[in-house]
């Protein structure tokens, strides 16, 4: 069995290039598709739509046990199969229980990118780490940014046109922060990454908090940290609203004038070049 360890980025990560140019996500128009669902960079979803209509498509899901479980993920897979009945999908479940965004940055090359056709990365990518960065990693803002930004930079380096959906799932501490008028640290960090790279977001934590406070549902009905079928259906409905919206009218690459030679990372120490090495090849001495 291969023995592995971590290597991380201590400098700017890989460039997010499309035909030699890079799109600045922060300059892209954004809009609220539905309550707590934000659409950014619809062009990338149009690219995914074209790929799916060609007959093939790579769709990947990265996260913790919420992704790994039989929950929202298979619901979205069924939605896509119904929407594109002639398409041969390669669905990738890269959820691993109790893992956070930092480990996600190390895993994404092997567990997602290399499992796609030609090792070129997914056409459509879903990622969630808000809950685990909060309750498992107890990450501060810097740690959450570095992990999630590392994931995004690795995906975009592999496939610059990947359409990405970032999902903020719910736990009680996250909802309590919203009730106190604050934005939870992990969601604040991941939102900063989403805004910087023009990534669409689905804020389940905020949606659920508002619905509970309005008396429309309960935490028990939703199903706790690992949602029950009804809770996962709520999440899938939010994602499907986003996808229905961005695929209703094809978007053109009208933002090409905003492209530049590079997008600087939010944090130069984010894990944009993170990966695995064999223990036998790892350098254990000589550091200064």
Question: Would you name each region that the model predicts?
Answer:
Residues 74-90, 99, 103-249:
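Alpha-helical cap/lid subdomain in secreted, periplasmic
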Residues 62-63, 94, 167:
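Short hydrophobic segments within beta-strands
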Residues 65-67, 98-101:
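Short strand->helix junction
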Residues 1-62, 66-89, 118-123, 233-288:
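N-terminal secretory targeting modules
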